[in-house]
């Protein structure tokens, strides 16, 4: 059996597709598994042993820029993909996505699997598009993204796993080693600090500077742990990913000695190297929070206004050492006591873990 799985979305979405790959490999060890990803999220699967081939297509739109050459490259790749004569093409993801359905239908697979049906963004023409699927599954908005992905394997004769299947990510050793060098330069020992992150697309999900200062002070006085502040570099109006420089600039020069700023370069894997050495981490809901959830220290993810934003039921960290807090409107509403209780829970978990998700953890 030859299977291709499409994942169009961002980094966190790709990480949450890894349990699907692991479960498929275990259930059908002889299957040939291909993954089709874009040039924004494909790196999450580098080194993943559960796929036989990773196809990467360039996005036509990158932030505010259009890349006409990407159209030509996608057409060339489509011709090569159709020659593979896949038995199944699956549009991974826990939502109804007409764009994903349209893309897998172009692949010429014998059977096509995706969620179909009601979606507030669907156009009237989408019903005809969904009708072309050989295996259109009804959308269940109560499931977590991981569970929704696993459910897409049922047309292949693969039942849902009995035990939880967790995401896995192989952070390359050079990033871990580079982070260790930076920590040494700051006089911070591995496992003796907590990461506080600002990275989020929406301001309502970010902790305030006052919260960051209070939390780091508590971690130092009560736990004897330093803190490392990580933020997204760049301007707030960046079309690829909004930056946090304007938030950090007013107080970066007056940080206390126990709060170290990590001037994260463009590649998020540099920040992940630091996270891999942390006792635990706090991040706003988003892709980096999911990556941090599979690090040795785990993560506390901060959610806000989930009546209009992704809900923890669908999007919480799906890992043994992942937990979350949910604020009515903004993360600034969260009490310090609630944050400290969650951090204590994470620190009570074992500080060293060996992941068994089918990919290397180092």
PLM regions and their residue ranges:
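Catalytic machinery of carbohydrate-active enzymes
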Residues: 1-362
């Amino acid at each position: 059996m030859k299977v291709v799985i499409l994942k169009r979305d961002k980094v966190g979405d790709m990480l949450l597709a890894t349990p699907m790959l692991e479960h498929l490999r275990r259930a059908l060890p002889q299957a040939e598994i291909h993954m089709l990803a874009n040039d924004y999220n494909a790196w999450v699967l580098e080194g993943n042993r559960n796929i036989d081939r990773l196809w990467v297509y360039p996005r036509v739109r990158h932030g505010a820029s259009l890349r006409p050459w990407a159209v030509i490259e996608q057409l060339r790749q489509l011709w090569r993909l159709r020659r593979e004569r896949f038995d199944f093409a699956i549009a991974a993801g826990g939502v109804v996505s007409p764009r994903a359905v349209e893309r897998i239908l172009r692949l010429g697979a014998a059977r096509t699997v995706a969620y179909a049906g009601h979606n507030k963004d669907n156009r009237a023409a989408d019903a005809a598009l969904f009708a072309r699927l050989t295996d259109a599954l009804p959308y269940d908005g109560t499931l977590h993204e991981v569970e929704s992905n696993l459910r897409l394997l049922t047309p292949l004769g693969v039942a849902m796993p009995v035990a939880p299947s967790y995401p896995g990510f192989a952070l390359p050793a050079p990033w871990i080693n580079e982070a260790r060098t930076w920590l040494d330069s700051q006089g911070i020992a591995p496992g003796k600090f907590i990461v506080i992150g600002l990275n989020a697309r929406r301001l309502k999900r970010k902790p305030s500077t006052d919260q960051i200062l209070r939390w780091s002070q508590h971690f130092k006085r009560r736990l004897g742990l330093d803190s490392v502040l990580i933020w997204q570099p760049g301007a707030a109006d960046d079309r690829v990913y909004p930056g946090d420089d304007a938030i950090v600039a007013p107080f970066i020069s007056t940080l206390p000695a126990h709060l170290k700023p990590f001037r994260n370069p463009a590649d998020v894997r540099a920040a992940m190297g630091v996270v891999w050495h942390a006792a635990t981490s706090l991040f706003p809901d988003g892709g980096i929070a999911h990556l941090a959830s599979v690090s040795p220290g785990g993560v506390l993810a901060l959610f806000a206004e989930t009546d209009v934003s992704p809900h923890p039921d669908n999007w919480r960290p799906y890992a043994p050492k992942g937990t979350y807090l949910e604020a009515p409107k903004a993360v600034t509403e969260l009490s310090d006591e609630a944050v400290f209780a969650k951090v204590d829970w994470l620190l009570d978990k074992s500080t060293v873990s060996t992941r068994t998700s089918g990919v290397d953890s180092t």
